[in-house]
Amino acid sequence: MAGKTLYDKLWDSHLVKQRDDGSALIYIDRHIIHEVTSPQAFEGLRLARRKPWRIDSIIATPDHNVPTTSERKGGIEAIEDQVSRLQVQTLDDNCDEYGITEFKMNDPRQGIVHVIGPEQGATLPGMSVVCGDSHTSTHGAFGALAHGIGTSEVEHVLATQCLVAKKMKNMLVSVEGQLPFGVTAKDIVLAVIGKIGTAGGNGYAIEFAGSAIRDLSIEGRMTICNMSIEAGARVGMVATDEKTIEYVKGRPFAPKGAEWDLAVEAWQDLVSDADAVFDTVVKLDAAQIKPQVSWGTSPEMVLAVDQNVPDPAQEPDLVKRGSIERALKYMGLKANQPITDIQLDRVFIGSCTNSRIEDLRAAADVAKGRKVAATIKQAIVVPGSGLIKAQAEKEGLDKVFIDAGFEWREPGCSMCLAMNPDRLGSGEHCASTSNRNFEGRQGAGGRTHLVSPAMAAAAAVTGRFIDVRELRNPA
């Protein structure tokens, strides 16, 4: 009998009932909620005269709509947008009513859901984790079964602690070798998406493995798993190892004492068996990956920084040719234009993909002693949580950014999506460390280019895309 993949093990350990129609009922260990997808779910509970089944499994924080400027210091009443103000207030009210742990807007522990969950130790190896947000795959970096759910499913999990789901196929993405200097986890995942496309992972749970993945920090692994959904996969994961255990140890929600010892023992099995069979295997050579930049309106439209924008006339597939033509028109680019010739208007360093302390350190390392280019209208740095902000300030990173001409903000989702005051104007090009570059994602008519934090900082100080390795020396 063939061995099991990590995904198989996680699925089997949470399976409550297999149903005749091919779907299954799975148990949920951790439910993370925010202000956008939870209000309707709580209202549904009230209408059905139900209460949350397991209060201690839920943590909450507002993130999508919260302002990242000093406006927030005036409290919820100071939020200018009426809908945003109502959603943040409703989350507070619902959590207060049911006794749910919430890190409110001005709590120093508040932040982006996919940053604070791991930061607090609320995400643990072997758990099943859901949230009403597609980037919940981030938590798979801990050897957890994690994926986003819709609002109706948020209500279902609140009421029953279970979820109806169908088992996915197994994909292994193996990245072997040593990454070149200046190449990061963000570049790996963009390269993966460029290789398999945004539909490549449809119907799969992706396990990321190989020496290059093992060499990444836990924060780097979170970046990789975060963008699994951009590759078409709801689930992305990395097997548990000593780095995972060391990261979790001592965090507020982590087990303590004898329970910790038992947990660590159980976590040793959270790896794919040596003889496990994957339905699909994708291989990348880490040494061949260069700093990546997305040029179009889909994450799969990505190239190395030293390449040129594609020429649709050279694409034989009529559907792909049409997609390239539409993307070029929306992005205001020309066929064969060098990536390094793209002029930028704004720079955003933040989001659940790249707002952790290592991301900020990498960006600050590039920004130190330099100035934001005069052609850049705005460059903002948004920490993923209040604790990360405090740590960065302790290290003096805020001063590095401010001295260089960046704006240093309060935590939140910010310019990743146009649901708060941070957004692009029509026609503006932005170097962004976020995860999506769809039309209008950062504001109506806005043009998003996905990059790593170091590449974003390099773009800010030069006004265009440049290989960050030209500005840094190997240690």
From Swiss-Prot:
The keyword Repeat does not apply. Pathway: Amino-acid biosynthesis; L-leucine biosynthesis; L-leucine from 3-methyl-2-oxobutanoate: step 2/4. The keyword Iron-sulfur applies. Its EC number is 4.2.1.33. GO terms for molecular function: 3-isopropylmalate dehydratase activity; 4 iron, 4 sulfur cluster binding; metal ion binding. Its cofactor is [4Fe-4S] cluster. One of its GO terms (biological process) is L-leucine biosynthetic process. Keywords: 4Fe-4S, Amino-acid biosynthesis, Branched-chain amino acid biosynthesis, Iron, Iron-sulfur, Leucine biosynthesis, Lyase, Metal-binding. Pfam families: Aconitase. InterPro entries: 3-IsopropMal_deHydase_lsu, Acnase/IPM_dHydase_lsu_aba_1/3, Acoase/IPM_deHydtase_lsu_aba, Aconitase_4Fe-4S_BS, Aconitase_4Fe-4S_dom, IPM_dehydratase_rel_enz, IPMI_cat. [4Fe-4S] cluster binds at residues 352, 413, 416. Disulfide bonds: none annotated. It comes from the Bacteria. Binds 1 [4Fe-4S] cluster per subunit. It catalyses: (2R,3S)-3-isopropylmalate = (2S)-2-isopropylmalate. It is an enzyme of class 4 (lyase). Belongs to the aconitase/IPM isomerase family. LeuC type 1 subfamily. PANTHER family: 3-ISOPROPYLMALATE DEHYDRATASE, HOMOACONITASE, MITOCHONDRIAL-RELATED. This is 3-isopropylmalate dehydratase large subunit. It comes from Pseudomonas syringae pv. tomato (strain ATCC BAA-871 / DC3000).
